[in-house]
Amino acid sequence: MPLNLNKKHKELKTTFNPFWSAAVVNEKNGLKNLKKAWGIIFKVLKVAIFIFLTIVGLWGCTQTLAQPWTGTNQLLGSGLEIGYNFGTTGDYRYDLQSNNVGPYFTFSDYTLAYGPFYGWFVWPASQIVLPIMYATRVPLGSGPELGFNMILSLIVLLFLVRLITIVITLNSTLALEKMNEVQGKLAEINAKYKGALDLQSKRNRQMEIMSLYKKHNIKSSASFVQVFVTLPIFLIIYRIVTTLRPIKAIILFNFWDLSKVPLTEIFSNFTSTGWTFIIFLIIVLPVQFISQKLPQIWASKRNENAKAHSQKSIEQLNKTKRMQLIFYFVFAVITAFSAAGVGVYWFLNALFTLLQSYLTHLFIVKRRTRRRLTYSKLEQMLERE
């Protein structure tokens, strides 16, 4: 009975205002056009940001080859250094001064003289690390600087970076989750056109896959977005770790000189300090590997009840694993051949990755549980009716 009253009420309302339907249609069309316009603007803006980040990344990679002052130098007081003007603090670890060995370039105030990459990105990020390190330092003459101030400053910087990029990384993870959820339907489409070599069948298969992705709001490019963002961030922090004067002056835990290159020390000064860097690599490299492996294990647990994967998706999964192994090998080489401060950054970054991946895992599991409860409640309501 209430349903009939509602229908009558709607009919009376429509009869009373004959222009109501047209107004609603116009309003919906206006909202649709506005949404479409915002979508186009957002896509253009996103493409512009990706192009900008790509240029920044390439600039950061090639600048060392083009300009002599961008080459990092392990010696304190050599190469390009970021710190305070000479005489500002009275602490040789923070005040910029040359050791008169080789070329020396100071970066104590904002300038674009060293290029936009340093001026726009490296300098602002260094002004987060440098004040924290100075405020939490062990004063000269009060004991050895064990490096806790550097660890604290890098944790703050990494936290801010993760806070900025969490939307991107979360979207990338959720996109992969959606891809896993539709693997069963994707396998059905591939099985449907298995052995079909004609052009029309290939087009139909591609259209059905695109329709499936669109239905579930899956963007195949989402997994690559993180790479575009990660590379410039790595280059920025790499430059900070290798050019910030107080980091070059630290002997971490009175054990590892962060200005030294692990592999060089192992082969040239093994009996004195080189052997300690073997321990350094044994600590840093496995943590980096675990930070890549554990998220895969968590993802497998989340999707262990999923339908069978298609042959193509299995090949894609194996390809992703191979790429991750290549990336890990590259990171291991960079850690071994760069100043030890870079290894400390990788270690802390790996811990952040593990924490963020675990929180994302919990978020996805909780969201799935909530969805299941919602679906079960709807089914119960339908059964009662």
Curated annotation (Swiss-Prot):
Tell where it localizes: Cell membrane
Coiled coil stretches, renumbered: none
The answer to keyword Signal applying to this record is: no
Keyword Membrane recorded: yes
Print the keywords alphabetically: Cell membrane, Chaperone, Membrane, Protein transport, Transmembrane, Transmembrane helix, Transport
Biological process (GO) annotations held by this record are:
protein insertion into membrane; protein transport
Tell me what topology the record assigns in the membrane.
Answer: Multi-pass membrane protein
Q: Where are the transmembrane segments?
A: 38-58, 112-132, 150-170, 224-244, 247-267, 270-290, 325-345, 346-366
Give an example GO cellular component term for this record: plasma membrane
A GO MF label: membrane insertase activity
Q: Which InterPro entries does the record cross-reference, listed alphabetically?
A: YidC/ALB3/OXA1/COX18, YidC/Oxa/ALB_C, YidC_ALB_C
Q: What does this protein do?
A: Required for the insertion and/or proper folding and/or complex formation of integral membrane proteins into the membrane. Involved in integration of membrane proteins that insert both dependently and independently of the Sec translocase complex, as well as at least some lipoproteins. Aids folding of multispanning membrane proteins.
Q: Which NCBIfam families does this UniProt record tie to the protein?
A: PRK02201.1-1, yidC_oxa1_cterm
The text of the family note is: Belongs to the OXA1/ALB3/YidC family. Type 1 subfamily.
- What does the subunit comment say? Interacts with the Sec translocase complex via SecD. Specifically interacts with transmembrane segments of nascent integral membrane proteins during membrane integration.
Protein name per its UniProtKB record: Membrane protein insertase YidC
What species does this protein belong to? Answer: Mycoplasma pneumoniae (strain ATCC 29342 / M129 / Subtype 1)
Gene symbol? yidC
